[in-house]
From Swiss-Prot:
It comes from the Bacteria. NCBIfam families: IMP_synth_hisH (TIGR01855). It comes from Prochlorococcus marinus (strain MIT 9313). This is Imidazole glycerol phosphate synthase subunit HisH 1. HAMAP family: HisH (MF_00278). The lineage of its organism: Bacteria, Bacillati, Cyanobacteriota, Cyanophyceae, Synechococcales. GO terms for biological process: L-histidine biosynthetic process. It catalyses: 5-[(5-phospho-1-deoxy-D-ribulos-1-ylimino)methylamino]-1-(5-phospho-beta-D-ribosyl)imidazole-4-carboxamide + L-glutamine = D-erythro-1-(imidazol-4-yl)glycerol 3-phosphate + 5-amino-1-(5-phospho-beta-D-ribosyl)imidazole-4-carboxamide + L-glutamate + H(+); L-glutamine + H2O = L-glutamate + NH4(+). Heterodimer of HisH and HisF. GO terms for molecular function: glutaminase activity; imidazoleglycerol-phosphate synthase activity; lyase activity. Pathway: Amino-acid biosynthesis; L-histidine biosynthesis; L-histidine from 5-phospho-alpha-D-ribose 1-diphosphate: step 5/9. IGPS catalyzes the conversion of PRFAR and glutamine to IGP, AICAR and glutamate. The HisH subunit provides the glutamine amidotransferase activity that produces the ammonia necessary to HisF for the synthesis of IGP and AICAR.
Length: 216
């Protein structure tokens, strides 16, 4: 089946660059505002986003995406990729934007929490710019032709802290180590903290590798 990407447009920004990246790759993609009732034509799903965890979850909940992703998309076993904020929303809970200091429920597709980065060496937040990404020993189809230590483009202040270290497929370092790529491989759910669509040739390779993933 020819790849066709559903790109979730929940008003979280960063949509245009993802659409443009797949247009350049010649991959069919559709920017969808509300959850579709018929998903037969879609082979892959991308949840992009920038902004705060609380605002992101508010948007997904109000538009009906939260339940749809868990109840409709996830059971199909088709690949799902979160990018930047989209990766963070895959977590069980997060603290960004909480007025009470209590955690805010996330999609809970990958067990973990979103916490403020704590860089040492007087490094400022947000973490903006190119940084090296180091793959774990877990070999996955996502990392094909991507060497450990290659640079990707980041913009973030919060990071994904996995409950199970095996869900962290790659790390980077900004004064302290943090998760750069996470996954629950058994559910075909993937997340990248950096922006592959803004990471030039290697980012293009990652987006192609995602499209090559099959349903689990």
């Amino acid at each position: 089946m020819t790849a066709c990407v559903l790109i979730v447009d929940a008003g979280l920004g960063n949509i245009g660059s993802v659409v443009a990246a797949y247009d350049r790759l010649g991959v069919r993609n559709f920017r969808i505002r509300k959850p579709p009732s018929d998903i037969a034509c879609y082979t892959h799903l991308i949840l992009p986003g920038v902004g705060s965890f609380s605002a992101g979850m508010d948007s997904l909940n109000s538009l009906g995406w939260s339940d749809w992703l868990k109840d409709v998309w996830l059971p199909t076993g088709r690949p799902l990729l979160g990018i930047c904020l989209g990766m963070q929303l895959l977590a069980s809970r997060g603290f960004e934007g909480s007025d009470s200091g209590n955690s805010i429920p996330g999609l809970d597709l990958i067990s973990g929490k979103i916490v403020l980065m704590s860089p040492s060496q007087n490094l400022a937040l947000p973490h903006v710019g190119w940084n090296s990404v180091y793959w774990s020993n877990t070999i996955t189809p996502l990392s094909v032709d991507i060497n450990s230590g290659c640079d990707f483009y980041f913009v973030h202040s919060y990071t994904f802290r996995c409950d199970d270290d095996s869900n962290c497929l790659a790390t980077s370092n900004y004064g302290s180590q943090f998760s750069a790529v996470v996954s629950d491989i058994s559910r075909n759910v993937w997340g990248m903290q950096f922006h592959p669509e803004k990471s030039q040739k290697l980012g293009k390779c990652l987006l192609q590798n995602f499209i090559a993933l099959n349903p689990c």
